């Protein structure tokens, strides 16, 4: 830990003056909300009859659908991603770097840490299948790998970034309008004409529109800092719009999935999710000066850098930590920790202990696997763009399959085609972890 803190302290000290620390701050805030939100939402209960119930805390929290407006922070990742990609694409726009090389480098950085996650869970499924009930193995593997939906979408948007950014440079905010128009058309087909399957296209249209707004944010920052007043107006307008389209029933209220609550704006995303993202951008702009002062302090900035350096590992492994702890807790001391009925006072009083355990387990996993965020292949990118395209399709497609179908069947049998596709895509892109250097 001391070595890591010393390393990140050097990174913090070497931060260029041109870096927008506000973007990093909100990315860290978002990952913490995601992690603790997932942990608090999870409820495991061994009922008096011995049956195991896997529940969601939002099922009994009052006005839980409205609460999701506070905890749904995925738009921040796409806003920050668009901002960062706009800055990183400068070399491509100037002709100093080929699109193929840029895409390959980004795919490696994003997918290399995913490879050990998939391999570990294939191994765990094979081992646990011999002595753990199949339904528990399936639920644990599914819970641990469902965050890969984000990687599936983000890998796709990043692979398209050289083209969508060039589109932005030509047409500017019109690109957001085009994507929003497409998303509205999909929502109409889904909710008015009863074609739910069409809604899945909005993973690209809605999140693509948010990503384009990230380009917009970056271009505004290059000219002048956006004022707090603009942020307040954007927040107020977006909030009013969000209330209007949900209160009138045009869109669901919930921004995350709530069991038994029906349709949500999350899976697949709707235009309401874009409006939530605009509201969050309003908050970012309105508080920008205060956050700049906070991040200018060395200790504050060092903390942000320390988390940012392992942010992908935290995201990928925080639910594995929960699954592994839960699997052990179900058998330790006759499952005493999980015999408390969820939603009761006793259950809420044990949440700090639950979170403490999960922070500890996640810390161990991060210490083991964070190295794969840095052990990125240095070999040249594929010579042909077709190879890169196939690699992107295989990696993004396998991530989507893992998060929706599962890496294992309900009988806890590994679906070998999925990890095979992931490894094949990683091999094509050079996204397999680089061997440890002994020099």
Placement of each model-derived feature along the sequence:
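Alpha-helical transmembrane segments and their immediate juxtamembrane cytosolic regions
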Residues: 2-439
């Amino acid at each position: 830990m001391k070595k890591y803190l010393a390393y990140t302290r050097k990174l913090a000290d070497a931060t260029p003056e041109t870096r927008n620390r506000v973007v990093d701050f909100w990315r860290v805030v978002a990952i913490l909300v995601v992690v603790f939100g997932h942990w608090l939402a999870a409820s495991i209960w061994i009922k008096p009859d011995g049956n195991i119930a896997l529940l969601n805390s939002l099922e009994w929290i009052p006005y839980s659908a409205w609460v999701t407006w506070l905890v749904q922070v995925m738009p921040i990742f796409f806003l920050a991603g668009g901002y960062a990609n706009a800055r990183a694409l400068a070399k491509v726009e100037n002709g100093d770097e080929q699109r193929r090389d840029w895409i390959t480098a980004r795919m490696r950085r994003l997918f290399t840490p995913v490879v050990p996650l998939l391999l570990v869970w294939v191994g765990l499924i094979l081992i646990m299948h011999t002595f753990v009930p199949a339904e528990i193995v399936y639920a644990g593997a599914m819970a641990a790998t469902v965050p890969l939906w984000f990687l599936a979408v983000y890998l796709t948007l990043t692979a398209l970034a050289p083209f969508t950014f060039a589109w932005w440079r030509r047409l500017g905010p019109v690109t957001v309008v085009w994507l929003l128009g497409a998303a509205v058309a999909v929502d109409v087909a889904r909710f008015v004409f009863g074609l739910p399957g069409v809604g899945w296209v909005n993973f690209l249209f809605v999140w693509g529109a948010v990503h384009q707004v990230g380009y917009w944010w970056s271009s505004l920052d290059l000219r002048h800092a956006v004022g707090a007043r603009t942020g307040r107006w954007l927040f107020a307008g977006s909030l009013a719009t969000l209330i209007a389209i949900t209160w009138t029933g045009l869109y669901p209220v919930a921004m995350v999935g709530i069991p038994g609550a029906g349709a949500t704006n999350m899976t697949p995303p709707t235009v309401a999710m874009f409006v939530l993202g605009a509201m969050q951008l309003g908050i970012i702009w309105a508080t920008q000066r205060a956050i700049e002062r906070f991040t200018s302090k060395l200790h504050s900035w060092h903390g942000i850098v320390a988390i940012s350096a392992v942010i992908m590992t935290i995201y990928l492994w925080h639910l594995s930590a929960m699954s592994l702890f839960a699997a052990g807790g179900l058998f330790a001391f006759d499952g005493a920790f999980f015999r408390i009925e969820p939603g009761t006072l006793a259950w809420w009083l044990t949440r700090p202990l639950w979170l403490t355990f999960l922070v500890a387990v996640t810390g161990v996993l991060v210490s083991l696997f964070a190295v794969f965020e840095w052990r990125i292949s240095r070999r040249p990118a594929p010579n042909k763009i077709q190879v890169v395209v196939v690699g992107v399709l295989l990696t993004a497609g396998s991530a989507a399959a893992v998060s929706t179908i599962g890496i294992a069947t309900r009988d806890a049998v590994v679906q070998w085609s999925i990890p095979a596709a992931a490894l094949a895509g990683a091999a094509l892109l050079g996204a397999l972890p680089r061997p440890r250097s002994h020099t």
